Design a protein with these regions (language model features):
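Predominantly soluble domains enriched in secretory-pathway, periplasmic, or organellar proteins
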Residues: 1-138
């Protein structure tokens, strides 16, 4: 959900899209498609997502595409793709929302994204096949 509960975002891994749903009307109001030059459509599989607290920017993990899509959460337009590790899956914002950490299951690491700059700043090696990640609120 967006923080104001106006939209529910649902990823469709096999369908390759994110559906935008109006929870009050229980209808799909839009779909976000992802197109990365040089990659087959079936390699682009949206899975984990996160939306900033201000509701302006969304990040979508694209699985075997090894990318995180940056999406304008107001217009639903994809603004850029960030190259991360192999098989990006889940993500979590740090409590101060300065960073977004994403798990890369096949490369056994976590990519650190600077949220304001919208760029990958670090890769941290972790245990084998990481999939989930979370932070406790302070």
């Amino acid at each position: 959900f967006k923080r104001d509960m106006s939209e529910l975002w649902v990823s469709s891994e096999i369908g390759g899209t994110v559906s935008i749903i109006d929870p009050a009307k229980r209808t799909v109001t839009g779909k976000i498609n992802f197109n990365i030059p040089g990659l087959r459509r079936e390699a682009i599989q949206p899975v984990g997502m996160g939306i900033t607290k201000d509701g302006k920017t969304a990040f979508v993990a694209l699985g075997p595409a090894n990318r995180v899509a940056v999406v304008d959460a107001t217009t639903h337009a994809v603004t850029k793709y960030l190259l991360v590790g192999q098989r990006v899956w889940q993500m979590a914002f740090t409590p101060d929302e300065k960073y977004l950490l994403v798990t890369n299951g096949v490369s056994n690491d976590v990519s650190v994204i600077d949220v304001a700059a919208q760029k990958v700043i670090k890769t941290i090696q972790v245990g084998e096949l990481p999939w989930g990640i979370t932070f406790a609120e302070p």
